[in-house]
Amino acid sequence: MQATDVIADMLTRIRNACSAKHETVDIPASNIKRAIANILLEEGYIKGIEEIDDGKQGVLRLKLKYTANKQNVISGLKRISKPGLRVYAGKSEIPKVLGGLGIAIISTSKGIMTDKKARAEGVGGEVLAFVW
């Protein structure tokens, strides 16, 4: 299956796996998905990332994280900038997710980063997604 919006496909796979309480979720690999997965790992939303070589583009296996009483650590994922309607934010307009409790994933000229890092670097860019 070929997805037209690979980031939305990734977020949907993670959301569905969390709802079903799966331990892992497999996502077809790409550089942008790898960068988003690394941000989720650094921010503590997932436990780990494993790269599997399948002879084609590869697969990212994300190890999902739950609290002690089996509640999802990721309570929400939302795609913001879509192929049909791109959303950009200047360095002074970078949104805060839930008053700073969540993260915004931003694609900048210096790479893909969180909203906090983009503010610190003084760069704006395309607002890819919100995670909370």
UniProtKB/Swiss-Prot annotation:
Cite the GO molecular-function annotations of the record.
rRNA binding; structural constituent of ribosome
A cellular component term from Gene Ontology for this protein is:
ribonucleoprotein complex
Entry keywords, A to Z: Ribonucleoprotein, Ribosomal protein, RNA-binding, rRNA-binding
Example GO biological process term? translation
Assembly and interaction partners: Part of the 30S ribosomal subunit. Contacts proteins S5 and S12.
- State the HAMAP family in the record: Ribosomal_uS8_B
Q: What is this protein called?
A: Small ribosomal subunit protein uS8
The organism encoding this protein is: Acetivibrio thermocellus (strain ATCC 27405 / DSM 1237 / JCM 9322 / NBRC 103400 / NCIMB 10682 / NRRL B-4536 / VPI 7372) (Clostridium thermocellum)
